[in-house]
A protein has these predicted regions:
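Core catalytic lobe of class I
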Residues: 1-265, 269-271
Length: 273
């Protein structure tokens, strides 16, 4: 594991920001006071949505967060917004799409709408199919400057097939052609959830909503490169920051809850030395 040094990043002459560190603060306040324009390569976060997640009684100011994220994101940078919708009286809120439209309104491109599909979701509904997914909106500031596609084996990996190849004599000649061994993944990503699926860090589940470490890693590898800055403005128990650090990216983790920041710090202690 590459051990990154803590680097001073002078975004505010009065408050030098240290990379690879956690901060207890309200994220809009933190961004306004500490992060320069066009300085973040990738933001990966999962905000509290509707009233499904009780976030220690704190207020979630979505519009201000979105505006600040646009300001601090580099040209070509990406924001991955992992979010779901409340279902009340059989009616989905669609808050996720309302938020996506607002991101688009303030200047982001909606580069992709991806699906985080949960393999073993415990939630059952009596009069509808089990709700087992969340959205992963990929917003970009212009065209993404980085895309490292994740590959997966093809169904017919290593097989050959006969194809018709018309030669100079205008006759079809059948030739063997080896099929591609791998392909780029689709935008529906499947993950097991719960202890052993989401993470093996038991302390992480003191936070009400933890997404899988592999999900975080897949996005970090896709939309950033080594040495880039990965930001999580609502870092909770620190999954984004942990996986950024372990993949040789710099991270900034912010959360308004001191309790959650302590959990995040403890998860990284074994790696940071």
């Amino acid at each position: 594991i590459f051990m990154q040094a803590q680097i001073e990043y002078d975004v505010n002459p009065n408050i030098p920001l240290i990379l690879n560190n956690f901060y207890v603060d309200e994220c809009v306040n933190f961004m306004k006071n500490n992060i320069m324009d066009d300085s973040i390569d990738l933001t990966l976060t999962s905000p509290p949505y509707d009233n499904l997640r009780i976030y220690n009684g704190f207020i979630f100011n979505f519009k201000e967060i979105a505006i600040e994220l646009y300001r601090i994101t580099k040209k070509g940078g990406v924001v991955v917004w992992v979010v779901g919708d409340k279902i009340k009286n059989g009616n989905k809120s669609l808050t996720s799409f309302k938020q996506a439209l607002y991101f688009q309104k303030i200047g982001f491109n909606v580069h992709d709408v991806m699906i985080y599909a949960k393999k073993n979701t415990p939630f059952m509904r009596s009069n509808a199919y089990t709700n087992s997914y969340e959205y992963m909106f990929v917003f970009s500031k212009g065209k993404p400057k980085t895309f490292n596609p994740i590959k997966e084996p093809t169904v017919r990996n290593g097989m050959e097939m006969l194809v018709a190849n018309k030669g100079s004599d205008a006759k079809n000649n059948k030739v063997l052609k080896e099929l591609k061994k791998e392909k780029t993944k689709s935008n529906i990503w499947y993950y097991a959830v719960g202890l052993g699926g989401t993470t093996n860090d038991k302390e992480a589940f003191q936070h009400p909503a933890v997404y899988p470490e592999q999900l975080a890693l897949d996005h970090i590898l896709s939309w950033s490169n080594e040495g880039d800055i990965v930001f999580d403005p609502m870092c909770g128990s620190g999954t984004t920051c942990k996986m950024a650090f372990l993949s040789n990216r710099n991270f900034i983790g912010v959360d308004i809850s001191e309790e959650y920041i302590e959990i995040a710090k403890n998860r990284l202690k074994k790696y940071k030395g």
